[in-house]
Regions:
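C-terminal accessory regions
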Residues: 131-268
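Conserved helicase motor core of P-loop NTPases
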Residues: 1-176
Length: 268
């Protein structure tokens, strides 16, 4: 990913052998590291890059990488708020990342892929064997396949335990059924699961019954970023330092530092 003129080359070479505990600015013609100590400045710089990404419809322009899911969720909420400066759930141009595979009307949403919100319309989603729910008919753009498709996305307040209980009840009934009744119950289960997407994990009794289909796509875990490349990467090294195992820390540092094609801004 880095050229011979990248200032990150020697850093990556070191990270192949051992983790790094002291970080400093490092500039190169084709790639530089900028260390930032203030979270506010780190987020402000990231927002500037995301504004370009949204304008250019370039989902591989920039990404924030962190270690923990909690930190990723906090970044996604913060960047969403800073970008749009209102309380609306969705906006035209919003970047959404898929957190599960989902098939609908011939289109397939792929786990860990980014999608761009082209338009959305408030609607009522008829969730079979449950009730009618508030939601949105969202038109998403798939940059990789140069195609658009629509998905039914539940409003956040509809992603609750009541729905999780219905899903788990039907699933349990299907598991415990026999013969034709078993086949029928599984058909009911898949009809239900295929009727909507969610922006939140659905829980009951402390267990995740269904993972979120989509979340905001501004920040992801370093683990989820493997295999991806971005023009610019923002790394929360403070969060990555939570990994106390030496080899785990080295791997996280190497993966995060090698995602960029040019520059890295690091929070330390």
């Amino acid at each position: 990913r880095q050229s011979e003129k990248s200032g990150l080359k020697d850093i990556l070479q070191t990270l192949r052998e051992s983790p790094i505990h002291q970080w400093n600015n490092c500039e190169g013609e084709d790639g530089s590291l900028f260390v930032e100590s203030k979270l506010e400045n780190f987020c402000r710089k990231a927002v500037s890059e995301f504004k370009y990404e949204i304008e250019a419809k370039d989902i591989l322009h920039t990404k924030i990488l962190a270690y923990t899911n909690t930190r990723v969720n906090n970044y996604n909420k913060a960047i969403h708020k800073l970008l749009w400066n209102d309380d609306n759930f969705l906006h035209k141009g919003e970047i959404l990342m898929a957190y599960e595979n989902f098939k609908k009307d011939g289109y397939e949403v792929t786990n860990s892929m980014d999608y761009i919100v082209e338009e959305f319309t408030p609607t009522i989603i008829d969730v079979p064997y449950y009730t009618k729910c508030k939601g949105y008919l969202v038109k998403l753009y798939d940059e990789y396949n140069n195609a658009s498709f629509k998905i039914p996305l539940l409003a956040p307040e509809e992603c609750n335990e009541d729905l999780a209980i219905v899903i788990e009840t039907i699933r349990t009934e299907a598991i415990n059924s026999q013969g034709y009744d078993r086949k029928k119950k599984w058909s009911i289960y898949y009809d239900l699961m295929g009727s909507f997407c969610t922006s939140k994990d659905l829980f009951t009794d402390g267990r995740c019954i269904r993972k979120a289909t989509f979340k905001y796509g501004y920040a992801i875990t370093t683990h989820r970023s493997q295999g991806s490349s971005y023009d610019n990467v923002f790394i929360d090294m403070k969060d990555i330092f939570r990994a106390k195992d030496k080899e785990t820390l080295r791997q996280l540092q190497y993966v995060s530092m090698s995602r960029t094609r040019s520059d890295i801004t690091m929070l330390l």
